[in-house]
């Protein structure tokens, strides 16, 4: 249950979403995420997530990529040794390529920066939120899947959610939009 403005709300049987933080301080310097349905085959989907991680002086990037094919097979790539995924991400383009177990998957997501929400993220040690994520809820995504060099599936979805996170990046986008200092989010332009 929750209480807001003196009103009591019950949520018995409701579906909920919980965000997993990336560590004690909440989020890495940069991260990316995306998912899409709405392909021509209704049971297909694509999801990915990645980020820059570090422990002391060690730094690396990791990305996981999961694709459900029209025939129901699910492909999971992202093990840095046997099925690595490379990601080149900007605020309006997500380009991923993964290989492993004979599979090759290419994903390209696109969404105009001005149509993104700027969302807050928590800074636990400071007990406050900060602008942190550039979130597109109406992007597009293309996927190409091959196995041992043979085409398996390719499609396009006009229904992709795409995110590029980073505190400095999100603050810069708020300033570009003319949002006052201290605000932690903004609607699309």
Regions found by a protein language model. Name each.
Residues 1-189:
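Structured soluble/peripheral alpha/beta segments that form catalytic or ligand/cofactor-binding pockets
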